[in-house]
């Protein structure tokens, strides 16, 4: 069958830069699904994305669907003809539906009888007849949170559409997509190259756009070019560019023809904390900061122009002029804020609401202070430093710098605390209280910082759950999932001796009578245990491994972690599957027995050699396991328990558990209960599949 290259390009106004890659990839994924569902065989699908276009190029697309034989079974012969051999109404109706007469139908004979049969060869539809609808369907399923209308049309898309190009080989496919008739015309760069030009064939794309339109349509090629040139530009001035992937992606999505340039700002601004300067360079201006080999900020920045200008110096001067007032603002705020101590902002926190039912930021600060001190005591941190850091934790929110540059909260508290002569551990804790800010982020470095970070997050969790505003579905306005996972990560990875139950109880107690939800403690603990499930699944642990541990509901995160890792290791042992099945069998037997079990196994009632051996093994193991359980050495404990495989197998093969003699039966059930209880010291392995 003939194969050709297919191209679709949707020319738009500037697309949202932070969504450009995801839109293009979703377009490709959706269209691949459409082609596969339509039975159109194809080769690789390349996606292209630039600020004003989304495009797909499909290699080796079949010219048509394959022909296929269709069969439609009709009525049974007994129902298809009457006593005189004439077709019944059922047979005639079926034949009409197939477009034939009854006498044209074939007959299908099977061991169950004979039926009328219609058999025909259905020719596959041409690709050009199918493609417009497939493109439209793929576009309609893009992940667009907000759609736009433009002109007087009811058509909606992420941005207004100006051109649509559909080419199959050299043939232009007529269609109207998103209200725009298709054509061969595509648009080039706004200020360089040709404004519009015609494509002769799909294979010319994207090279013709590069040569005549001065647009690099290949997203990853554009990104690689920016990265390479920015690294080289930084090296030329003896520095290293901060090319964070998120900003690199955003800049890639803003330019069609990237030109990397280097600019400067006055060295006097380096007296301002680097975080504030970087915030305005990266956040407001989309510039890449430059650091020296020691990690110190240089008075330079790298930016990406969207035009290859004859007068690059003018563009550089323009960008330097734009950033200067922002840096001057930061300098002014920094000087002004330091005219008073950080602690002087405490009274002003009373005028800022944390949450209507939960009081002001000052109220929250007082709770954090008390809770941080309590946590510090539990984990062996300096209580005085933890309470001091808790007291100052929100003071920087009232500074000019943080008001203007919101992402500098915490870090500016650290700088102002240092200026005031606070202890270094207190100052660092003010910055690290927000850690981890996102998945994979660093954790607080000191125990004091850990205490404040946990206190802040637990106060929010207790308060919001206490007024019944817990996350619902995808909505989590107070970022409670992130807060819960942050607490768990800190406690687990820092191996802190904290219990979620007592921690939550203390956080709730500090609210006094403000919380109306009577089950708030249980709700918060259950929510946090649920976060464990998500966390360990992402780490690659099996769902039933996590469920086995959750069945025991251990509320000490470090202990929970040890159990999960122990069960994951246990699963790799050759004895695991048999012992998991045995535990399931034991659980079922005990659930159905209805007998009241004894506290201890009575040796005099043990009759069979297999039950005597199992009982002896349990006694020996109990002595070995007691210190392992006490120290949380669950992996070693499960390895020891794995030695029970043969005694357990022998027991079930040779012993009748539900004996007629009541005392013997109860003794055997008690023995099995002792066996199960040993495993339950770690997890309920009966749930393992």
Swiss-Prot record:
InterPro entries: DALR_anticod-bd (IPR008909), Gly-tRNA-synth_bsu (IPR015944), Gly-tRNA-synth_heterodimer (IPR006194). Keywords: Aminoacyl-tRNA synthetase, ATP-binding, Cytoplasm, Ligase, Nucleotide-binding, Protein biosynthesis. It is found in: Cytoplasm. It is an enzyme of class 6 (ligase). It catalyses: tRNA(Gly) + glycine + ATP = glycyl-tRNA(Gly) + AMP + diphosphate. It comes from the Bacteria. One of its GO terms (molecular function) is ATP binding. One of its GO terms (cellular component) is cytosol. Belongs to the class-II aminoacyl-tRNA synthetase family. Tetramer of two alpha and two beta subunits. HAMAP family: Gly_tRNA_synth_beta. This is Glycine--tRNA ligase beta subunit.
């Amino acid at each position: 069958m003939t194969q050709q290259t297919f191209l679709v390009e949707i020319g738009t106004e500037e697309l949202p830069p932070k969504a450009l890659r995801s839109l293009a990839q979703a377009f490709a994924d959706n269209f691949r699904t459409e082609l596969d569902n339509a039975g159109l065989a194809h080769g690789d699908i390349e996606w292209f994305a630039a600020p004003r276009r989304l495009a797909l190029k499909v290699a080796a697309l079949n010219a048509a669907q394959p022909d296929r034989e269709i069969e439609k079974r009709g009525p049974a012969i007994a129902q298809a003809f009457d006593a005189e051999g004439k077709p019944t109404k059922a047979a005639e109706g079926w034949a009409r539906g197939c477009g034939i007469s009854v006498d044209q139908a074939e007959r299908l004979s099977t061991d169950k009888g004979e039926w009328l049969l219609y058999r025909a060869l259905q020719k596959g539809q041409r690709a050009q007849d199918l493609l417009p609808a497939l493109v439209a369907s793929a576009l309609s399923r893009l992940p667009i949170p907000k759609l736009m209308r433009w002109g007087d049309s009811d058509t909606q898309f992420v941005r207004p559409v100006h051109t649509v190009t559909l080419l199959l080989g050299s043939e232009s496919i007529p269609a109207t997509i998103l209200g725009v008739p298709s054509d061969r015309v595509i648009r080039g760069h706004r200020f360089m190259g040709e404004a519009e030009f015609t494509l002769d064939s799909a294979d010319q794309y994207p090279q013709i756009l590069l040569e005549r339109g001065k647009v690099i349509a290949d997203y990853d090629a554009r990104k690689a070019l920016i990265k390479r040139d920015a690294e080289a530009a930084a090296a030329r001035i003896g520095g290293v560019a901060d090319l964070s992937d998120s900003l690199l992606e955003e800049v890639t999505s803003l330019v069609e023809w990237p030109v990397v340039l280097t600019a400067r700002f006055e060295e006097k601004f380096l007296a301002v904390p680097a975080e504030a300067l970087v915030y305005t360079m990266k956040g407001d201006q989309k510039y890449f900061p430059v650091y020296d080999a020691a990690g110190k900020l240089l008075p330079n920045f790298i930016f990406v122009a969207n035009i290859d200008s004859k007068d690059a110096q003018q563009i550089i001067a323009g960008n330097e002029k734009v950033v200067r007032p922002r840096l001057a603002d930061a300098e002014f705020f920094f000087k002004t804020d330091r005219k008073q101590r950080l602690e002087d902002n405490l009274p002003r926190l009373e005028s800022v609401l944390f949450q209507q039912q939960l009081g002001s930021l000052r109220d929250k600060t007082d709770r954090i202070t008390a809770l941080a001190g309590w946590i510090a005591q539990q984990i062996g941190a300096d209580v005085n430093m933890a309470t001091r850091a808790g007291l100052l934790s929100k003071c920087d929110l009232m500074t000019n710098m943080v008001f203007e540059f919101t992402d500098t909260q915490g870090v500016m508290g650290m700088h102002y605390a240092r200026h005031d002569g606070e202890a270094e551990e207190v100052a660092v804790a003010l910055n690290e209280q927000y850690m981890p800010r996102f998945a994979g982020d660093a954790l607080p470095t000191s125990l004091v910082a850990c205490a404040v970070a946990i206190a802040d997050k637990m106060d929010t969790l207790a308060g919001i759950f206490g007024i019944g505003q817990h996350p619902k579905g995808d909505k989590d306005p107070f970022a409670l999932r992130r807060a819960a996972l942050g607490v768990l990560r800190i406690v687990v990875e820092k191996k802190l001796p904290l219990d979620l139950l007592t921690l939550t109880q203390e956080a709730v107690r500090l609210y006094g009578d403000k919380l109306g939800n009577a089950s708030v403690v249980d709700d918060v603990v259950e929510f946090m245990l649920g976060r464990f499930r998500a966390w360990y699944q992402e780490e690659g642990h099996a769902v039933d491994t996590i469920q086995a541990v959750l069945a025991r509901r251990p509320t000490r995160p470090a202990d929970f972690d040890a159990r999960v890792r122990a069960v994951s290791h246990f699963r790799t042992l050759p004895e695991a599957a048999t012992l998991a099945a045995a535990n399931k069998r034991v659980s079922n037997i005990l659930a159905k027995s209805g007998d009241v079990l004894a506290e201890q196994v009575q040796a005099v009632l043990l009759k069979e050699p297999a039950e005597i051996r199992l009982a002896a093994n349990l006694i020996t193991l109990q002595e070995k396991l007691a210190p392992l359980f006490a120290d949380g050495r669950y992996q070693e404990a499960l390895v020891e328990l794995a030695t029970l495989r043969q005694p357990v197998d022998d027991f079930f093969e040779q012993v009748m558990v539900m004996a007629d003699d009541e005392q013997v039966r109860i003794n055997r059930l008690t023995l099995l209960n002792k066996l199960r209880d040993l495993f339950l010291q770690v997890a309920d392995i009966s749930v393992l599949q």
